[in-house]
Amino acid sequence: GSLTGLISMPRT
């Protein structure tokens, strides 16, 4: 849900 979150794991 965050900036880096979207890049590493967008929706896991």
Curated annotation (Swiss-Prot):
Residues bearing PTM Threonine amide: 12
GO biological process: neuropeptide signaling pathway
Keyword set, alphabetical order: Amidation, Neuropeptide, Secreted
Subcellular compartments: Secreted
Range of residues in the leader sequence: none
Tissue: Expressed in abdominal perisympathetic organs and abdominal ganglia.
Protein name: Periviscerokinin-2
